Curated annotation (Swiss-Prot):
Signal peptide range: none
Protein's name in the database: UPF0461 protein C5orf24 homolog
Domain of life: Eukaryota
Alphabetized PANTHER family for the sequence: UPF0461 PROTEIN C5ORF24
Cystine pairings recorded for this chain: none
Biased composition (Basic residues): 78-92
Similarity section: Belongs to the UPF0461 family.
Segments of skewed composition (Polar residues): 60-69, 94-107
Positions of region (Disordered): 60-140
């Protein structure tokens, strides 16, 4: 409720706000006639049931104890169930060895690593290197380049495939120079 404050009120201007609030007159409930006449219509009596605190605490404590012990049992059971048919991350049944021939989950042969670059099969027996002469998946010997075989099919007589274009260009220039030598300009 807003009330104009006069400037002559010294207590409001000089002292703190808490003293001003304490001096303010509060209106009682009796001043509102509407509330007094219809009090029974809007206000309901509040009844509290007496509940003993001891029984609630004992119920809560026993409930907490049983739930935590049950949770621990189920967690340990889940761990046991997870490890029943496997050993570790390999994905092979427990009791078998690597040499039994089980592949890893990625599909590469056992004994190979991801860094070796094997996806399913390397194209040569395991334990051999590229230098051993086994052909890689496209069917050509290791170290060969596709471009060399393509350049060889173009028909340039040069043995050096890297300089085939400049050689052909220089041949054309030499033939033009030779014709001018045979027929000097007069």
């Amino acid at each position: 409720m807003m009330r104009p404050v006069s400037s002559s009120n010294v207590a409001f201007c000089t002292s703190g706000k808490s003293s001003c609030l304490n001096q303010d007159t509060m209106r009682g409930v009796d001043q509102f006639g509407l509330y007094a006449t219809q009090q029974s219509k809007y206000s309901h009596p509040v009844t509290h049931k007496n509940i003993s605190c001891q029984t609630q605490e004992t119920i809560n404590e026993t409930h907490l104890q049983t739930s935590t012990s049950r949770d621990l049992d189920t967690k340990s059971d889940l761990k046991k169930k997870k490890n029943l048919g496997r050993s570790g991350k390999r994905g092979r049944p427990s009791g078998t060895t690597k040499s039994a021939g089980y592949r890893t989950s990625t599909g590469r042969p056992l004994g190979t690593t991801k860094a070796a670059g094997f996806k399913t099969s390397p194209g040569r027996p395991l334990g051999t290197t590229k230098a051993a002469g086994y052909k890689v998946s496209p069917g050509r010997p290791p170290g060969s380049i596709k471009a060399l075989s393509r350049l060889a099919n173009l028909g340039y007589p040069s043995n050096n495939a890297g300089f085939s274009y400049p050689t052909a260009l220089s041949r054309g220039l030499h033939s033009a120079v030779e014709t001018t030598l045979k027929h000097p300009i007069e």
